[in-house]
Amino acid sequence: MNLKTTLLLIIGGGLGALARYYISGILPVYKDFPLGTLLVNSIASFILGYLYGLLFFGFEVSSEWRIFLGTGFCGGLSTFSTFSYETFSLLREGEYLLAFMNVVANVLVTITLVFLGFILARR
């Protein structure tokens, strides 16, 4: 890995992490449901779907943008570990329905948004 790639990852990941911090801070929990985590994972999924949709449909996206936006920003923005911890916490607190809803919402919403981003890139 060269210096340029390293810097793109550091800057993209740092900006994604900052965005996650502020978005999750605005919407940390809604009636015991971790809405902030769902939102950041959803945004990152849409962006990643759109980015790779552009590539699939033949648009030129430089490797720098893929590294900066895809791996860096989306990687810093999304958070599987927080999602896992919040689900575990809900289970530990006996909030089984909310834990189930959190898993279903994160999986279905994020996959749907990857698909939507991918399709919208075609236009």
Swiss-Prot record:
Q: Which reaction does it catalyse?
A: fluoride(in) = fluoride(out)
Spell out the subcellular localization from the entry: Cell membrane
Sorted alphabetically, the Gene Ontology cellular component annotations on this record are:
plasma membrane
* UniProt topology in membrane: Multi-pass membrane protein
What broad class describes the main subcellular location of this protein? membrane
Output one GO MF annotation: metal ion binding
Q: What does this protein do?
A: Fluoride-specific ion channel. Important for reducing fluoride concentration in the cell, thus reducing its toxicity.
Mind telling me what this protein is named? Fluoride-specific ion channel FluC
Organism, scientific name:
Pyrococcus abyssi (strain GE5 / Orsay)
The top of its lineage is: Archaea, Methanobacteriati, Methanobacteriota, Thermococci, Thermococcales
Q: Which gene encodes it?
A: fluC
